[in-house]
Amino acid sequence: MEEAELVKGRLQAITDKRKIQEEISQKRLKIEEEKLKHQHLKKKALREKWLLDGIGSGKEHDEMKKQNQQDQHQTQVLEQSILRLEKEIQDLEKAELQISANEEVILKKLKSIERTTEDIIRSVKVEKEEIPEESIEDIYANIPDLPSSYIPSRLRKERNEESDDEQNRKALYAMEIKVEKDLKTGESVVLSSIPLPSDDFKSTGIKVYEDRQKSVYAVSSNQNTAYNGTDGLAPVEVEDLLRQASERNSKSPTEYHEPVYANPFCRPMTPQRERVISPGPNSQERMVMMKANGLDHHESESVHGMTDGLSERRSNGLAHTSPTRPTPQPRSKVQQVEEMVHTQQKRMPSPWEESSIRQNEYEVSPRTELSPSRASPGKSGPQCSSPICQEEADVRYNIVHSLPPDVDDTEPVTMIFMGYQQADENEEEKKLLTGYDGVIHAELVVIDDEAEDDEGQAEKPSYHPVAPCSQVYQPAKPTPLPRKRSEVSPHENTNHKSPHKNSISLKEQEERLGSPARHSPLGVPGAGDGTEDPSLTALRIRMAKLGKKVI
């Protein structure tokens, strides 16, 4: 009751204080109005007094004098009213201060008497404890004709919960998570997470979070119970810590190991250059070895005129097969090559063809030289009539693409380009090409030291083992020179152009180099007195210094 009276006294003080404040504001407005009137009357009285000084005696003078006296009287009344209002305002302000002081006293008393929320909750709990609740058993006991064996479902559920409480709350698994919390930002970082056996887990520490599924206990870094002021964790924080711990467990360091294959035949062996002594058994044995290694790519070898023992292996990932596979011939130092040479019409080389010719001047075949003197039209091998077969033979036995098997790729080789010559139809050419039957036979001569001809030399791979299947490594393919439509020979297959159709044959090159009437191609001056070409002389001098002999 005392608290209620104090609350009422405080409310009354607040109301009186509010009324006094409104009254003070009204009186101040009235004072402002009185001051305005007082100033107006003062100005009017001064003006009338100034006018009376200039007017003589008479009726008008008397009236103005009387009006001036009335104005002065009103001015005095206004001054008194203003003073009275100011005094009343001062009294009201004093009363307001007194009411405020009384309000503060009442507020202090209320704070000393008023109960906190905890006290109110505690008192409510005590009141509930004082009032005994009727149990369910007592309620059902008052029901007549109820069998004694009947147990209400609610009571049965409560009994089951009490009996199975320990079993339901037994930990299925436990995990120790080390967490570092930044006191500035409040962020928690999981340092490590270690799973623990649920049997060895003991509820040590302060419980900071619990629901029907999981419980979280806070333990200090020295495995002791954390201090009692540990704050609880929100469900969001618990979920975040569990997510970080699971992510940390899922991360495993990268392990590097050797490649593992399902069977030992899934990776091809590095292809080696073969050193064929007898033609028959070696080729068959090598083919069986490739199949045993489990190669998925079809290997095709075209052996044509194998007097040199050279074989080109072509393979790709598209199951390419060779049209023919002739029987290899015994090995020797000379490889006979067939080329079909077609007579071209008269034309000048275009600028791009000239640049391509200059580029081809520096194409090198390691440790190989051409000897025009050994070309004989009588040594012709088997010929193929189809254009596709001719192109394959042209590419297969081209001197730029052929590579002897016993050449060491690491040693440098010097070659001198002899030049190109356009084939023109004239009388001189007809004289030079007497007995020409459409086929020129060239010989590939390998200049090598006899002492280095060691058959037991270590074998080296002919090309990269995975180059045909690689998408990164693709060897450059020779591009054919551009030709006009009118300059294409009708005997050539235009769908399969070979980049070496325009190259001059060795026999024709020899005859033109030895001819005094022909001019040297590419601007090299030839001797006009019948002597041999200076480039050929330079070649002979170079070979003589090396201890070789040009045949």
UniProtKB/Swiss-Prot annotation:
The modification Phosphoserine is found at residues 135, 163, 322, 350, 371, 376, 385-386, 498, 515, 520. Residues 12-106 form a coiled coil. It holds the Pfam family Paralemmin. The modification Phosphothreonine is found at residue 270. Keywords: Acetylation, Cell projection, Coiled coil, Cytoplasm, Isopeptide bond, Phosphoprotein, Synapse, Ubl conjugation. Expressed in the brain and the spinal cord. Expressed in the anterior olfactory nucleus, the olfactory tubercle, the nucleus supraopticus, the nucleus of the lateral olfactory tract, the piriform cortex, the cortico-amygdaloid transition zone, the septofimbrial nucleus and the indusium griseum (at protein level). GO terms for biological process: regulation of cell shape. Residues 247-267, 298-387, 452-536 are annotated as: Disordered. Residues 247-258, 484-495 have a biased composition (Basic and acidic residues). The modification N-acetylmethionine is found at residue 1. Phosphorylated. One of its GO terms (cellular component) is membrane. InterPro entries: Paralemmin. This is Palmdelphin. It comes from Rattus norvegicus. The gene is Palmd.
